[in-house]
Amino acid sequence: MNDLPFWKSKTLAEMTAPEWESLCDGCGLCCLNKLEEWDSGDIYFTSVSCKLLDGESCRCSSYENRWDFVPDCVQLTKENVPDIAWLPPTCGYRLINEGRDLYWWHPLVSGDPETVHAAGISARGRTISETEIDIEDLEDYVVDWPLTVGEEKDEEEA
């Protein structure tokens, strides 16, 4: 019998639907609006969230019906995760796809959905809804913290 947790013993393709869904740590970073530079293809995160992101829970407020309200919402699938370069470096889907383990604060490891927030990984308290800004000003909200959350601080900074 295998005593390893499923994320250590299965590939993304082998996971059941409930296992797949549980890989989401609830950080909300994938629900931030992003800008793509046309000539280079570079992706830039903004602090502007999808109108459906609940800023406190960092979960979609209409997950099952999100495409009714946000037709271009990107669904993470076993097939497309390897090709989505903008997934944050702490994303459970990205980590498992890269053969890495989940961090201590991931709810599957900690047993507590609040640890992702307590560890400062999530978007909680850092965003503004797209309904509250002029979308023409989106570039004014470019941030790098979604790509640096979870990085070890230098001793001088700590």
Curated annotation (Swiss-Prot):
Annotated InterPro entries: Puta_zinc/iron-chelating_dom, UCP006173
Pfam family, one: CxxCxxCC
Annotated transmembrane regions: none
Domain of life of the source: Bacteria
The family this protein is said to belong to: Belongs to the UPF0260 family.
Name used for this protein in its record: UPF0260 protein RHECIAT_CH0001358
